[in-house]
Amino acid sequence: KLERTPSEESDESEEAFMFHTKETLGSMHQPLMFTAWVHGVSGMCAMILKLWGFKRYTASNGCSYWINAPMAKEDEWVEARRETGDDARPILSGCAVDDVDAEVAKPIIFVHGLGVGLAPYLPNIAQLLRSKPGRKIALLSLPHISMRATPKVPEIDAMVDTVAELTTKHKLRAPCLYGHSFGTFVIARTCHRYRVSSVVLLDPVAICLCLPKTVSILYHLGNCWSSFKSYVKNNGTKAMFTTTFWRDGGDVLYYLLRDYFLVREIGVMTALRRKFWWATHNLWADQIPDNSLIVLEAHDMLIDCEAVAKHVLRQSNARVIWQDNFSHGMFISPWGFSLRHEVATFLDALPTHS
């Protein structure tokens, strides 16, 4: 018979067991005006993408994407091939080995993170188009993590199926998978199922997903409200309108807004709690393709950047960019131009036939 020691009993009283797939969903209803605003932002983004030459398609499983390349005829589709050897995964490429059509640049498949969809990434997409005007770019659209009213929350494997399908239907030769935040989970799962040429991961929450910091940030949402109340109690409500608060207490406000207006949205909560399997979506460094780039923003509050950087540098051949003084998602801001330019330069240098 096993008996717990006093130290184990004390640990149990301090740490609660987490079972995110069975616990109460914990979602919050969003105001109708807020949902309407999000859909309006999505509509404006769609208009801009159409002006830039993108067209929206729906995959066979219902997931949608935008791409600036035409769909090939069905008799030209090339199924993913396998090579002999120990690695039995099919190769993610929509072109045959003997297809010699020249590509202007490495095709890109981009997967966005939590937020309001593709709209915040438009400056990033614009820079990629300017660096190589003829570049083929596909953009996965994930409305269930964009705070939009949607009746279905797909599994991540369904998003991976969409990546493979669009690669085949639009004849993308060995595309580079480019993802931010939640999008890195889709890319991680794609790397598990396919042999991928290269990846670019921004704020890679999928790498070392087992680290305690990532776990606590994603699921221990109740602490943000108590932290905010404690800050106001100790400093008074007037403290919220001082420069000191925005410098030192900004993190508290960030968590409050994020947890109660973004992460608590029903589609996002379903994706993170009911459709999320840790072991399946985790990415280890030795699973990252050689011609890859990992971008870490030093003040990222969602991941342990130092631990991730050490793991990637020790166990893979990927290049790592460490951006000081940036927090999660700041690369999409106006002052992230140079960082986006560095990513575009990396993508421009990738070989198109491997």
Residue positions per predicted region:
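Gly/Ala-rich beta-loop-alpha elbow adjacent to hydrolase catalytic centers
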Residues: 178-188
